[in-house]
Regions:
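Central P-loop NTPase core of STAND/AAA+ ATPases
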Residues: 100-126
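Walker A/P-loop nucleotide-binding motif
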Residues: 46-66
């Protein structure tokens, strides 16, 4: 109710700073522009892992939502999962569900078979497959190893699945230093850490989001943003 009164008073048509990622509000700061270039390069390779890390609120999910909005579904089939504390077997079933697959049986082998058959069908139809995995810091080593194994699926010499991994800074550290992740590290073809926005960009960012919900007033040049 208070939010509606606030919006009515200022003539806003929506919530400019809602927490849910919305590609409409994407603002290309310097660090996001760099991340998008790494993403574009990585996805063009069509294989391996692309890694984007950043603090909570850095804009990882909004960046990916912006990217997803530009994807041609006739050429790329994308699925996204937000991970909790999953082990390897649970992860495989979650991936199958994300691609809309019905798995006969509850064992890992059945889920893997369904995923591989699906990836082969998509490849024959001329579509690449992308799996976006959010909150990767929640995954244990067994689950990360399952992701690496999924990325091994091929049709001839053609990789069938590419993975985009999103995580908080602790995932970046784990990926860089854990001895059990050496093979996964070798499969990373592009990575970027989202830094904080430059102080000089904050005003433009606020105005950008306000303008998208109907704000028609100029911000005072001396306005203090904190």
């Amino acid at each position: 109710r208070h939010c509606k009164m606030f919006n009515d008073f200022y003539g806003l048509t929506g919530r400019p700073f809602q927490l849910t990622p919305d590609p409409t509000f994407y603002f290309e700061s310097l660090t996001h522009r760099k991340a998008l270039s790494y993403l574009s390069y990585g996805l063009a390779q069509g294989e391996g892992f692309v890694v984007i890390t950043g603090e909570v609120g850095a804009g990882k999910s909004t960046l990916v939502a912006h990217l997803m909005a530009t994807i041609d579904p006739a050429r790329l089939t994308a699925a996204q999962i937000v991970t909790s504390k999953l082990d390897g077997e649970e992860l495989v079933h979650v991936v199958a569900q994300a691609f809309g697959l019905i798995v006969d049986g509850h064992d890992k082998a059945s889920a893997l078979g369904a995923i591989e058959a699906f990836l082969h069908d998509e490849a024959r139809a001329g579509r690449r497959c992308l799996l976006v995995v959010d909150e990767c810091q929640n995954l244990d080593l067994a689950a990360l190893e399952e992701l690496r194994m999924l990325s091994n699926f091929q049709l001839g010499s053609h990789p069938l699945l590419q993975c985009l991994l999103l995580g908080q800074p602790e995932f970046r550290r784990t990926l860089a230093h854990h001895p059990g992740l050496e093979q996964l590290r070798q499969r990373v073809i592009a990575s970027h850490h989202l830094d904080a926005m430059e102080p000089s960009e904050v005003g433009a960012y606020v105005e950008h989001r306000l303008a998208l919900v109907g704000w028609q007033h100029a911000m005072h040049p001396g306005a203090h943003l904190s």
